[in-house]
Amino acid sequence: MSVIPPKFFKIANISIGCIDIIAALSQLTYIFTNLNVFLLAVYGLALSVPIVYLEFKVPSNLYRYASFYFSFLGRGLSYILLSLIISFGGIYNILAGMFTFILGVAFIVFHFSQFVEEPANFRAPGSSLSIGDDDIDDDDDMI
């Protein structure tokens, strides 16, 4: 019973990832003038490249080591962190940071909403149940 189609999340994640990669690449030019902004760009790239990559292929080990990419709350918080990281520089970086921040807040709202179903790439590989499923037979029978 999802109000938002799953295609929206794929488009949103790819667009945020691409916008943030471009913003982080533009911050890499500060290597000689401001080392702090350059280091933030490196962290921005490290956080934004997996966002785009996860929309096409989900590595099996990534769910174990970076599970925040597989929930609305984790992704929302990482988008907010990423927006703060990439917002240094020109007007493009500020706009990209604002857009990423707004989408991060939206993902946090989606986490607490009952009407939004998580996308297929948020589920752990090999598991048929996801977080929030009530299909578990919980009889509390002791053997």
Swiss-Prot record:
InterPro entries: Golgi_TVP15. Residues 32-35, 89 are lumenal. GO terms for biological process: vesicle-mediated transport. The keyword Transmembrane applies. One of its GO terms (molecular function) is identical protein binding. The chain crosses the membrane at residues 11-31, 36-56, 68-88, 90-110. GO terms for cellular component: Golgi membrane. It comes from the Eukaryota. Golgi membrane protein involved in vesicular trafficking. Belongs to the TVP15 family. This is Golgi apparatus membrane protein TVP15. It comes from Saccharomyces cerevisiae (strain ATCC 204508 / S288c) (Baker's yeast). The gene is TVP15.
